[in-house]
């Protein structure tokens, strides 16, 4: 019988109306002078995984042994999600029963196990970054790993290092660790290690340039009815080559060095090509230059093409369907990928690499699923029993929720400890804090953000915003936390314990009563908030990204009313990022200001502990707070007539993001990056530097690749009957299968490959590559800097000396000052310790866009050690 396999260009083809010419790299990589457009060069083929010497070799040996025995259908089943709500998790792959591989469970998110019962809502990435505590970065990762493992999750969709947080109004900034790539990289690497120590694979996201939520997706009424219907394409993040390497790619390199198993590509375009089909970003930067050995998974329906995304390096499609096509049974992959392999549009070697990378990542991270570690929850119902496949009401009714409590003393303690150490003391005049029960006998608490939301906390993806802030909204939230403690609960409990007269006024608009009560209070605490989240939820007109940096709920007027009537007013800011504080920061009656990011379930406990002195503040700002809102990089809201919005603000600011911009332009911020007061004073002195390893200008050549491998099963493509849908299987309409229908006929695929397309693998790595996270030499210690720190106060406390590096002033490359080290040390009263910072070769390097490699310039460098980027206490020079 003659069999014809149709290849639909709509489903499998390019899927994008973008230029496909090759592009020569220039000083501004990605910017084409001739067309005056940002264009991503093509890079082919996808580097085959498992060829780095000494890296993941055991994992690849095991993976290759399995894949070599698999059929095309079995391999495809690993690459494609089964469809939205067609499994217990937010993402479920197909299974390979013949080899004991069940459906893989992929579950959000960076703050905890989303959409499950009894899970802990942990402090956000932003709050975690504010601790500047490497030990807590790891412990939080371990606690997350324990809970994901206990719920039967195989792949945790976090941590987030994209967004980098370059835009103060960015909706999802709270998920990541702050507005600095070095801080983000250190925190992400530790989080990944903690997760994967607990046999849960981490998935670092969003790759790359996902700096705003507005226009992150093309218009689709099923996704967001408020989007401009003329938006034909997602926004393009236009990023120059040097900024790409020194800023946006930096924390991904740390993540890969830490052994992360998977990377999630984002919805947006990068230099006018969609992230999940951007061969330069995935094949070249991620898999070739950074030596990534795991697999790339799409954000949910961020895949915009079939064959094109496959040859561009995408390895897994989630949740399987097309954008806006939930539960339609339509996919770019699944059956269509099977077709594309059989008619040789997608080389079978590429499919082999996808499947091998997925299995190797499972082995390398010890997250390979077992029969006793399967999901014990449903993401889509809170009931104990429900349909096996939520969307298919004809599927069997089974026990879907086992109500497993994944928390223990370690996870509870870690959540509170991170929350406490993340809180930043911004102002503390007249020793207002900690609160002294002897001085404060009458205490007033006010503000909507102090108490519970009238709607409770089980709103869709934490979209209840008329109460205390625990998380931002969206898929990065936990959803159904076990409990949440408000500031009202804990502040009132401490007031009772200290026998204070206490009152709480929630009203924030009619200020008559609060003004009257404040005039009689010895101290007034005002808790305020500003919230953001993911763009699929629109709250008070905010489409994920904030419309402004103003406090919510009339809070500026509330603070003014209280402060004008109480000479001892404490403002507690709870927010997902920077807020405008100019209306009250210098008010003489506002004697203390505290900032807290989304602190998770124990938010109220942590805030009260800091205010009442049960814990000392030791957090530092992971971003810059400006005096003028004009100093923030704006959110792009302009949609051009062609319906293809572009974000050129990233290119315009280039390397000058957050504190780099303020320092370079000599702009005084309200609160600088790294700023944070303490209840003690410290002395920083006696900086010394020593060379650990000779550093040449250029990187050494990396080790050669191991030999390319093949499974020698190309004859499979001659037997499409092997892929027919099993005649005895029950077929669910919405489910995404890898099988072919038996009534199709076979003809040659007619696919227009991009110019420069090739299937020939490299035999040698490029100079900046060859190792996990890049050339191994980048990760060698080049210099060590020591400094003495001493606690001059009266209580044991934690102190964070920070090292900023200043490059040679006469160098070829203009390089802004940048964070290159921090340590958190505990010191008892009078105690002195020597703190050591290690400067890696990469910390000294700049990206040479001409040589397309990292180089170390000769000249005099200065290591600046201080307590904030603009508060340097001592420094030391060294010459290379």
Curated annotation (Swiss-Prot):
Q: Which domain of life is it from?
A: Eukaryota
N-terminal signal peptide: 1-17
The top EC class is hydrolase
Query: EC number(s) for this protein?
Result: 3.2.1.21
**UniProt catalytic activity:** Hydrolysis of terminal, non-reducing beta-D-glucosyl residues with release of beta-D-glucose
Molecular functions (GO terms): beta-glucosidase activity
Q: Which GO terms describe its biological process?
A: cellulose catabolic process
User: Which UniProt keywords are given for this protein, alphabetically ordered?
Assistant: Carbohydrate metabolism, Cellulose degradation, Glycoprotein, Glycosidase, Hydrolase, Polysaccharide degradation, Signal
| Keyword flag Hydrolase | yes
Q: Name one Pfam family in it.
A: Glyco_hydro_3
> Which pathway does it operate in?
Glycan metabolism; cellulose degradation
Sugar attachment sites: 24, 77, 271, 336, 343, 376, 548, 589, 712, 743, 794
Annotated SMART domains: Fn3_like (SM01217)
Catalytic residues per the record? Answer: 299
Family (UniProt): Belongs to the glycosyl hydrolase 3 family.
Q: What is this protein called?
A: Beta-glucosidase 2
Q: Which organism is it from?
A: Saccharomycopsis fibuligera
